[in-house]
C-alpha cells in the first residue's frame, strides 16, 4: 500500500497513520512487526517508559534490512520535569541514547507544565514524582524558555522538527508569535466526545499538522482508573458509531479512526495484538459520508479525559 503523508510547515513529511507506543506491551516485537507491516510513524515519549524497547525494535528492523532510518518518522516528547533550559538537551540526549538513534524526526513538549527537576539516577522516567513523595512541586519556567531550548536542538540537528502537545489555542497563538522556529505539529486528545473543532481549524490555518490521540475516547483511560472514563459510555458501543459501522461494513474502531484521519488529522492508535496492525494501517481505504460526519458532530460533549486539573488543579484547559 502507499502511505498517505501530511506536509509539515518546514517541508518535512509525517505519515498520516502511525503506531502509538503508550502502554505498548512487548514493545520491541510489536514495533518490529509494525515496520514489517508497513508502519513508518512511531509516537513515543520519555514518560511512556519503554523507549529502550521501542528503539530495540526499530534498530532490529534497520539491521535486518526491513527499512532505512531515513524512511522512519520517530516522535518523542519532553517530560514536565525537564523544562528548564539547562535540562532540555539532557532529556533529549537521554531519550536518543535509550533509542540508540542520532536524531528524532519530531520532538514535542508533552505538556505546558513544569515540574521540579528530578535527576535521571533518582527516578527515570519520573512521571509525577517531584522528589518528595506524592507531592507536586513546580518550577517557574515559562514556556518560551523551554521552547528556545528546543529550537536549539533543531539548530544542532538532534531533532528535525519541534511541536507541542496538550495546549490551548491561546497558548499556541502566543507561542507562534514568540517562536523563532514555529511549531510544526500539535498533538491533542481527539475523539467524538472531544472534537476541539476551533483548535483544530486554527492549527491547520497556521500550517500546523494536528495529531489526535485517544481516538477511542474513554477506553484508553479505564486502565488508569479515570473516574470520568468509568462513567462514560464507550464510543465503540455508541449507537451513532455502531450504526455507521454497520452501514460501511466496518468495526466501530475503524469508523472512529477514519473519522479523525478524514479530517486531515494524523492518527497513532496502539495495536495490542499483531492482527490489528494491518486493520489500523488500512483504515483510510474507505470514506465516511457527509451525513456520517453530521451525525458524529452531534456527539461532541467537550469531554476531556486527560485533564491536568484532575492531577493537582493545574489550569491547562480552564
From Swiss-Prot:
A Pfam family: Aldo_ket_red
EC number of the protein: 1.1.1.307
Gene3D superfamilies: NADP-dependent oxidoreductase domain
Site label Lowers pKa of active site Tyr, positions: 77
Pathway: Carbohydrate metabolism; D-xylose degradation
Reaction catalysed by this enzyme: xylitol + NAD(+) = D-xylose + NADH + H(+); xylitol + NADP(+) = D-xylose + NADPH + H(+)
EC class name: oxidoreductase
Chain residues that bind NAD(+): 165-166, 214-223, 270-280
CDD domains named in the record: AKR_AKR2B1-10 (cd19113)
Gene Ontology process terms (BP): D-xylose catabolic process
Active-site annotation: 48 (proton donor)
Keywords carried by this UniProt record: Carbohydrate metabolism, NAD, NADP, Oxidoreductase, Xylose metabolism
A molecular function GO annotation: D-xylose reductase (NADPH) activity
Described function: Reduces D-xylose into xylitol. Has a preference for NADPH, but can also utilize NADH as cosubstrate.
Record-stated family: Belongs to the aldo/keto reductase family.
The name this protein goes by in its record: NAD(P)H-dependent D-xylose reductase
Gene it is expressed from: XYL1
